Amino acid sequence: MDTAIDFIYLSEPDMIAAGVTDMAACVDTMQDMFKLLYAGDYRMAGPNSDSHGAMITFPDPPPFPTMPRNTPDRRLMAMPAYLGGSFGTFGVKWYGSNVENREKGLPRSILMFMLSDVDTGAPLALMSANLLSAYRTGAVPGVGARLLARPDARTVGVAGPGVMARTRRARCGDEVNDGPFQEGRRAGPHDS
């Protein structure tokens, strides 16, 4: 019996080549996902199957010399989910975040995504997920703009500008009247 498990690794350039930055497709996918959530054809972590994941935290001060310090924005999270419908997939987003990463020339958050076979649990792909998460985040309000914006809407507002706000603003603008918005407004402590 062959017990080898093959899976692919998709780096950030591989993810771009696979279409992760196709925002229109991201919005379509998120709209399909919301329909499945509404129907209940999904599962997440937690006792009610709707938890946003499991996060590791650290005591302050750390009781052991090798234990990470409890610092602002230090997060280590596993975010598992099953999505049914035509997706029929199981995956886990690994979220590692530390504001001190910037001092090392790294992004604040470093994300990976493991896609697994629903029946066997075997890994299918391990993916760089910073762009995946950013474009998914931007696509969600794009769905809202698509479905809820008035036909004459020309202004989009973004609360909490930052890295994620760039994709939110870009997508909402494309969804309003099938074209770029004429005015953008932001509210938050950081420039986007």
For each feature predicted by the language model, list its residue ranges.
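N-terminal ligand-binding/catalytic initiation module
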Residues: 1-133
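Glycine-rich adenosine-cofactor-binding loop
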Residues: 138-144, 148-192
